[in-house]
A protein has these predicted regions:
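Acidic, surface-exposed loops and disordered segments
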Residues: 2-257
Length: 257
């Protein structure tokens, strides 16, 4: 919202976590005019094209200038974006992701929740993920949801993710914060939004690999592997890959009160 406003020459003031209501994340006010710059326009233009690409990426790095620009977004917010290019370290992180897959898929509650979000793009729900996210045609999304809910596919998912990281992810990216509370989570989201748009504007893409952070026992191991005093909040892959279909989302009128 702040990025879009700047594109239109509007300055917004954001008050984060303004009340004791945990669902009241921010109060946003229009405070005046601002002179937009080229970056504002580039990020705004990238919004309709932003996708999560879960396939393997090309074996080439993002340009150094783009990597620095993404890291600077995090630094400006007092957070850290660690880019992992080392092959050995990426393999170690791949092992953590695979272990997280096995742990999560062994839990029927996790499988039920994941399956509940798998819908065809033609579904009336207009949210969630298509079965294409799991390598199947969109028309088989309902079948895919049934399979996910019923069977523990952790070993297969783990093997596929590990292969994709080792041989199809030239850069792993870890967003991290000094502390680990609601304000840190909100800041991470704001940094993430800007970084993803920066990648999209440059023709790159990204995907989430957050298993080592979602599984409580693995998060300290990821932190130790990164040799950081910051707390990991998000693990992602950055690179160049094939374009993905747009994910269906609810109309604007459905999400405004």
């Amino acid at each position: 919202l702040v990025i879009a406003a700047r594109h239109f020459g509007c300055e917004l003031a954001v008050e984060e976590l303004p009340s004791s209501d945990p669902d009241h994340l921010a109060t946003i006010r229009l405070v005046g005019a601002v002179t937009s710059d080229a970056v504002d326009h580039e990020l705004f233009a990238a919004m309709p094209h932003r996708r999560t690409t879960r396939t393997k990426y090309e074996d080439r790095l993002l340009p150094e200038e783009l990597r620095h620009a993404c890291c600077n977004v995090a630094t400006e917010r007092g957070t850290e974006l660690a880019l992992v290019l080392d092959e050995g370290k990426r393999a170690e992180i791949a092992d953590l992701v695979a272990e997280g897959d096995r742990i999560q898929f062994a839990d029927p509650r996790f499988r039920r929740e994941l399956a509940a979000w798998v819908h065809s793009r033609r579904s009336a729900t207009q949210d969630g993920m298509s079965g294409e996210s799991f390598g199947m045609p969109d028309v088989l999304s309902s079948v895919g949801a049934l399979v996910i809910r019923t069977f523990d596919m952790g070993k297969g998912i783990a093997a596929g993710d590990r292969e994709k990281i080792v041989n199809g992810s030239p850069i792993l990216a870890v967003f991290a914060t000094r502390d680990d509370g609601p304000k840190d989570w909100l800041t991470t989201g704001r940094v993430l939004a800007r970084v993803l748009l920066r990648l999209t504007a440059s023709g790159a893409t990204a995907a989430f690999l957050n298993q080592p952070i979602e599984v409580e026992s693995l998060r300290p191991r990821l932190k130790e592997l990164l040799s950081t005093v910051f707390t990991p909040q998000l693990l992602m892959r950055f690179g160049y890959g094939s374009s993905a279909h747009q994910t269906v989302r609810r109309p604007l009128d459905d999400v405004f009160m």
